[in-house]
Amino acid sequence: VPERCIYGETLLKIDHVSLSYDEKVILRDVNAEIRNIVREGRTQGQVVGFLGPSGIGKTQLFRIIAGLNHPTSGQVLVNSTLTPVKAGMVGVVAQNYPLFENRTIFSNLLLAANQMEKSSEAAREKVIKYLQRLDMVDQSQLYPAQISGGQRQRVAIAQQLLCSEHFLLMDEPFSGLDVVMEAKVCELINEIACLDELNTIIVVTHDVTAAATVADHLWLMGRDRDASGNAIPGARIQETYDLIERDMCWHPEITNSPKFLEFVREVKERFQTL
C-alpha cells in the first residue's frame, strides 16, 4: 500500500511558459507545479527528476526557473506567496561546484548565509546547523582544495540553500560518477529535501535510473508529433510520473525490485520517442 501523504501548498508553478528566439520556438506552453509533501507528521520538499533528450530545451527552462532568463510569455512563480521568480531566489548547483578557493568552508557558507539572514549571529547559527546535518563540521576550517569531490558537492549544495529561498536546481549531479558515488549523491539529495520542510529540489539529468531512484516525481520533456510523426517545434513537459502514488518513494531497497526495474524500462521507452 502506498505511504499516505498529503500535498500541501504550491511552492513553485511554471505557468504557460513559452520561449522563442527570432522565428525558432524552443519552449511551447510549459506547465508544471511543485507542492510540498506532508508524510508521517513531517513536511518535506519535493524532489523532481527533470529528464529530456539533449538539445530539447532543458537548459533554457532551467535558466528560466532560476530567474536567470525571461520567457517570451508565461511566468514562473515561487514560494507559497507565488511571487514571480527573480535571480537569486533559486539556488543553482553547477556541475563543477564553484566555491571561493581562498576561503575556508565555514567562510564560504557564512558569506552565503549573510545574504539571507538579518543578523550575523543568525547566519553563523544556520551555517553550523547545515555543517552538522551534512556531517561536515570537521572540514569547516579547511579550504575547498583540501576536501574530496563528494564533500565539495555537499558544500556547494549547502551554499546555494543558504543564499536562496529553499529552491535548488541541480545540473547533471550524476555526470561521470561511479555506482557507489551515485548512490551517495542520491542519499544526499534526500537528506537535503528533509533538512527543511520547504526545501525543493529539481534534478536535471539524462540518467533515468538515478532520477527515478532519488525523485518523488519525474518530468519528461519532449516535442509533440504531428499526424505524420514529425516533431512540432517547441518542447513542453510531455509526461509527469508520480512515484509516491506508485509506492516507489522512500524505500532504499526499491531499486532492486521488479516493479522499479519495469518502471525504469517504461520511462526509457517513452524517452526514446521524444
Summary of predicted features, one role per range:
Residues E182-E197:
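Helical segment within the ABC ATPase nucleotide-binding domain
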Residues A66:
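Helix-to-loop junction immediately C-terminal to a conserved catalytic motif
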Residues L168-E172:
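Catalytic Walker B motif of ABC-type/P-loop ATPase nucleotide-binding domains
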Residues F106-N114, R124:
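Short helical segment in ABC ATPase nucleotide-binding domains corresponding to the A-loop/adjacent helical element
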Residues L162-H166:
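A short, proline-enriched helix->beta-strand linker immediately N-terminal to the Walker B motif
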Residues G74-K86:
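Conserved ABC transporter NBD signature motif
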Residues Y130-S148:
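Conserved ABC nucleotide-binding domain
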Residues I157:
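Hydrophobic anchor residue at the start of the ABC signature
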